[in-house]
Amino acid sequence: MADEALAGLDEGALRKLLEVTADLAERRRIRSAIRELQRQELEREEEALASKRFRAERQDNKENWLHSQQREAEQRAALARLAGQLESMNDVEELTALLRSAGEYEERKLIRAAIRRVRAQEIEAATLAGRLYSGRPNSGSREDSKGLAAHRLEQCEVPEREEQEQQAEVSKPTPTPEGTSQDVTTVTLLLRAPPGSTSSSPASPSSSPTPASPEPPLEPAEAQCLTAEVPGSPEPPPSPPKTTSPEPQESPTLPSTEGQVVNKLLSGPKETPAAQSPTRGPSDTKRADVAGPRPCQRSLSVLSPRQPAQNRESTPLASGPSSFQRAGSVRDRVHKFTSDSPMAARLQDGTPQAALSPLTPARLLGPSLTSTTPASSSSGSSSRGPSDTSSRFSKEQRGVAQPLAQLRSCPQEEGPRGRGLAARPLENRAGGPVARSEEPGAPLPVAVGTAEPGGSMKTTFTIEIKDGRGQASTGRVLLPTGNQRAELTLGLRAPPTLLSTSSGGKSTITRVNSPGTLARLGSVTHVTSFSHAPPSSRGGCSIKMEAEPAEPLAAAVEAANGAEQTRVNKAPEGRSPLSAEELMTIEDEGVLDKMLDQSTDFEERKLIRAALRELRQRKRDQRDKERERRLQEARGRPGEGRGNTATETTTRHSQRAADGSAVSTVTKTERLVHSNDGTRTARTTTVESSFVRRSENGSGSTMMQTKTFSSSSSSKKMGSIFDREDQASPRAGSLAALEKRQAEKKKELMKAQSLPKTSASQARKAMIEKLEKEGAAGSPGGPRAAVQRSTSFGVPNANSIKQMLLDWCRAKTRGYEHVDIQNFSSSWSDGMAFCALVHNFFPEAFDYGQLSPQNRRQNFEVAFSSAEMLVDCVPLVEVDDMMIMGKKPDPKCVFTYVQSLYNHLRRHELRLRGKNV
């Protein structure tokens, strides 16, 4: 029945009942009921969280269920009306504003769906407009497109036939079956040429060719290459010059399937770039262009399938003074696509432009898609499907005065695995020096930059690694300066050993390990190579680039290296281990305490603690011997101390054997001591027995035994340690007083042990206070008989004294705001506890309500100055020191000052009591 009554109560009522209940069995039942209530509450919360789209009001509205049903019906009707309104809305900005103002999840879901629908319609319209604007016939058959592609690829062949054949063998595709997990690497280079570039420009944008390997036919809808002629030419030329014509080379439009795509377009020297808007579905890649006045749009796309693992070979790449060997890396693929293809793009604008040179081929690790498209600075939009990647670039750089290169990360979603890889655009400043390819003597594959002050250039790299394994991604940025080579690792696992090569000068690498770090480089003028380590080595996709000196980082690197070396050198240096013999020679506990605080080694701390125990034991033994000596001296002194009346009775009983061979003597001495005020009585009984036996030859043996019994009684009131007053008159340190105190200690200790815990602590505190008072009292004429502390009588250690002081401070500051005294460190950090302590004794000294925990300095100054002025308590800790120590001041400093404050305030309190009496 009692359990049922408890089950009907809430947790607050049960806790109040627990506070007033003393029966252990009843308290156990109440605690069980509280635990059951908490368990039920947790279960309800777990069920609510497990339910989809949890709403708290639906759970709490159980009493008005009908109204809740009506409200849900109204919400459904409102959603239906909203869906009808959204069908007629085609403005993305209006829908976005509506989305921001919507508060319900279902409404926001409908608005997001409408925004996706409108964007899809815009993309379709832009794609159609781009097709119509390009003037390219869309009704051409697959065979016509195939022939056109072959014809244009044949026009762009380079003289190096050996490298062409070798590259064609390397890049020969291997079909990958659908439905299997494969790695897809996407490298997108967006180059925007200045509109008014002339023949005086040192370099102009040129895109890299692709390998002329046999390609299977692909669907035209999946790979479109839209181009426009230079202003003034309505139609693109059917057969442009091979390598020296200033007119742009047209790119073939190949049919597209799930296999490979080769679309080659080169940007002309006088073309205005157009924006590119890629849209990728879950299993294919679609390219669509945003409608608008775009004179030129060209792209380069290569998609090759993954080769079997056993066919992958490691071919070293010649890179400056050292060789960079990484089999099947993105670096190898880009070298193959840009430098080793049968087509070489050479643009001439008054002066010969940079040409592409072959490099040593390397086998591909997996399928890769490389796209090079001039990007417009005015607009760029992208739309993502369930697993697509989008990048929007609408920022342009103006002239040489623009900021340094910025690395930005854009979120993207990939595949069913859901692994996101950040696509980081790189904005470069125009006018930088021309960098060289990694092969000595080779012309640069991509050269960008202008010499005009008003010119602008934008290069964007989008690197996408699609992996079926769904591995976690990490990033690392390596930023050198000067002639050094910067290496940027995007979103992949770092290799165990990262190799870096430089074309000349010193090589200094600063490693920044945070993946999301924004790094600023110098004016990057040339992308030298790409590098991707195979999955077996968990390598990263690296972009290497030449950079102008932006700021001297070498000093910082050297400083960091020096600091590291300093730490390494300092590590072996340590203090010699302490020995037990050295510690035994230390006689000061304070020194050992400091050593214990400063030591961090476990063995040293163990030795120091052992030495502390030994030292304390020696001091205890010394105190015991001193006490025995004083007892003997007190026994030899005649008379009793002043203020006491003593009565002594001695009884002696002797017994002799009949033959006289043995004598037994018993002496009993009773001493009764009364204090003059009649509050204390001490009784001491001493029994001495001796047994003497004589042998026949005259020798004898004596055995003596002494027993002492002491008892005392006191009618003095026992109270709290803080309510007792000091003794005004000193007392005599006689033998009777010592014996009486010893008996009182034993009696009060037994009483404290028999009481409950709260009463035991109070009795122990009262006993300690009384012992300290009695120990301080003594005869002025003779030596003061101080009571020595001993663990046998329960005398507290330092921790208990600190706890007693904390209890006193809590009692005096109870009820003050912003005061919660739990320790001698953080509880005193804002100064409010000091102010409350002083204000409790001197309410008229200052207005406590005007103080604030935020104004720490004022609190310390008010408390310290008031205590010094009112009770002459010198501030043992400075205000500046407390401010410097912050939220966790030194406990020893705080304890020392609080102890001094306690002594002065207690004296003031006792003086007030004496005046009132």
Curated annotation (Swiss-Prot):
Keywords: Acetylation, Coiled coil, Cytoplasm, Cytoskeleton, Phosphoprotein
Annotated tissue distribution: Smooth muscle; contractile or vascular (for the long form).
Role according to the record: Structural protein of the cytoskeleton.
Organism of derivation: Homo sapiens (Human)
Coiled-coil region: 24-89, 603-630
One Gene Ontology term of the molecular function aspect: actin binding
Any one GO CC term of the record: cytoskeleton
Modified residues (Phosphothreonine): T351, T360, T373
Modified residues (N-acetylalanine): A2
Protein name: Smoothelin
Residues modified to Phosphoserine: S299, S301, S304, S341, S357, S503, S514, S523, S576, S729, S792
